[in-house]
Amino acid sequence: MQKGKVRNMFSGGNTSKGFFSRFDHIMSREDARRIFVIKGGPGTGKGTFMRNISEIMTDRRYDTEHIHCSSDSKSLDALVIPELKVALLDGTAPHVIDPKVPGAVDEIINLGEYWCDSALAEKRDEIMKVSDEIRVYFQRAYRYLKAAWHIYEDSSTMYGSAMDKVRLNSIAGEFTAMLFDVFPPAGKPGRQRCLFASAITPDGLVSYVDDLMTLDNIYVFEGFPGSGTDIVLERIKTAAVERGFDVEAFYCGFDPDKLEHLIIPEINTGFSTAGKYHSTDACANKRVDFRELLDDSAISKLGPELEY
């Protein structure tokens, strides 16, 4: 018997702005039939609990979404069963969540009820010491990421200064016309679900882009930071939402304000950015190389700074 499909993604990330959470976008309470908020400390089995439920549901041919933890990509922060409008969320730090519509929508599952207090009490000092060390190392890692962002921003600005903005606007116009010209603006805008397709983790960069790009129509934008891929994606996203289409917007795991991938489920269409750190092996309907929009003479003058 065919099993349900599993989609993988992240709702939070270790970014240049520190830990950045989009937990509120996992499932809106307006849509949800039930949201289970799971409490309990590290190691209490929250991720295993969600994986076991996912396995049971996929065996019953339900599709599921695995929302992975950026601090441990093998663990889950949440599980979504879209057809049933049910979500299970890890409600502990760094994304502490409490029921907003208790009883009617939200319900707490406290796995902390099943730990052995006496055994943990014996390890009290060791647990506190390790927790403090983890906090210090995370803070240090975020300082490094913030420092790297300034170099990234400088390079992006230089590439942006050499970009042909007329051609960039033309590309944005071509895609919005191709996709949406037959659709008038809607009375009610579409909704945006904002998450991450990749994350910086203790195992390095983990990406689920290929896992998400399983649509009939896929367009790949190739380019450097600053070459305008995100600008065109934002234009397409805005046009889709204005016409009433719901979208899934996946942002950069390093720069959480930069749009990298876009899915418009209703028209079975996806856009993916391909660069140095991530690309998709999906069969694309069309690839657009944004590096061709850069002025070669301007880039050559910036060469020493960019190489640095």
How would you label these PLM feature ranges?
Residues I35-S54, D203-V206, T214-A240:
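Glycine-rich phosphate-binding P-loop
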Residues R34, P184-K188, N217:
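N-terminal low-complexity, Ser/Thr/acidic repeat segments characteristic of secreted
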Residues Q2-F20, E55-A119, D125-E126, A240-Y308:
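Conserved nucleotide-sensing/catalytic segment adjacent to the nucleotide-binding pocket
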Residues M27-S28, A78:
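Short secondary-structure boundary/capping segments within folded domains
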Residues M1-M27, V166-D210:
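N-terminal pre-Walker A segment at the start of P-loop NTPase domains
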Residues E126-L179, Y308:
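An accessory alpha-helical subdomain
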Residues Q2, D24, C69, E153-A162, ...:
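Extended intrinsically disordered terminal tails
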